[in-house]
Each structure stands twice: as structure tokens, then as C-alpha cells.
Amino acid sequence: AGAAAQLITYYVATISNGPSGTAPVLARAGINADGTFDAQPAPVAVGAVGRQALFGVDCASNATAATGGITNYRTWSQVVSAQIAGRVRSVLYAVVTRTLQTDARNPVVNAVPIPSPNLGTGDPTFTPFYPRTTDEQRDRYTVHVAEVALRNQIWGN
């Protein structure tokens, strides 16, 4: 018998921060094929307030021959609607984190821009993160962006 199928998902949640309230956290959960949790969701990184992903594809349409490289970036809904899931070569993701202590001396932040790739005309971009409260506008923010190549897709060309 083989191992059961499982989906690992990451999401932004809040956890209790004792008497000071709550703190944002990047959480991880394993979901079994039958829809049950493998274990309780676990916090991975405190301070995470946003995450986004774009998918590097080899041509934005099946009408064009594959090149063996990444020619465009797409959102997942664009990948699905164009039926090019087999052409996804990488996942480019961004995680926005913030400090846990607000300081009135910090400059007011109305938006946190996230650098986006620009390979082809019409490529989507990451959406800036917008602080939701006055206190959040006085936090300091960091954007972490990384790209992960999908090995089987690259070598299976």
C-alpha cells in the first residue's frame, strides 16, 4: 500500500499573544485526501501578514511551442483558464512580515509594495499590502520574495 495523498497548505492566521492580544502568523496545515487535518495547524513564522504567488510558465498558451524556459508569469486562475498547468516551471512567492511592536516614531506606511517580475506583456503583478489599522501603519515591514523551480517540469520538457 502506498502513502495516502496529502495537501500541505500555508495561510496567514492570528494567534493569541497573551495579554497584549493577537499576533499575525504564517501557519502550515496538512490536509489528508479525505479532508481531515493530518495534525493541528502549526505556526511557522510570527509576524507574517500577507502572502502571494505567481507561476512561471513556458509560454502563456498551448498554441505556442514550449521553449524550455520561463516566458511569462501567471496567477493560478490564469493557469487554469488557459489550461497550461503542465507548463508551470516555477512558483514565485512573496511573504510580507511586520514587526510585532508598534512605535509612534515610525513613519506612517500606507502601502507595502512587492517587487514583481516583468517578462512579458500582460504579466500580472503582486498586489501591494495595505495596513488595515492605524497601529499597523506604524509597524515596519519586510518583503521576502523567492522563486522555486519545479524540478520535474524543467527536466521533463
Give residue ranges: language-model regions:
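Short linear sequence signals and composition-biased patches located at protein termini or domain-edge surfaces
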Residues: 2-5, 14-20, 32-157
